[in-house]
């Protein structure tokens, strides 16, 4: 904890009003703690975007068909997405990793989305994709209908009402939103909410890209790499690790 404390002291003793930099101060202290550097660096920042397709898409829970996932991946690779511009501007190394897009997971409103073996394989892919020389890791995803999977995971984990946690995703109208809520409720009723491990809930309600995100988070923790998670889908996947330990995501923001 010494680099963290020293960074706190440096910020405290700087010629400026106390706390005037807001959360930037907290971010610098957090980075210093995980990197074990008084002056944390962002010289080798990586962004990993995982893509996967979901069988539950056949239930009409998204405004777009599943083949849009592959189209978006191609757009990423051509440099045509917002994340490409952000990474270019900030000198971040971007990797887009599609995972078996031609083989969607199964419809989890009727059966488990994946077997444990394929779930662990996706987690291993995410684990292996983290470069040990990285000093800050950004994680993102792409997958038509993965807001449905993320909401199902979050509601199962935190025992929350589905209506309160379900959004319009890529732009559902009221009728399709009601259908999405109904599909998630059916899945939770079918599978229950008492999951004993991250891999079991990911296998039942998740997707390959969500499992890969979890694998990357585990690798980053072991390598002391701080992680930035992009949005609800990433954080829902990450939250599965709290089944083990509430502090296991301390290296993530």
Describe each PLM feature range.
Residues 38-98:
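Active-site cofactor/substrate anionic-group-binding motifs, chiefly glycine-
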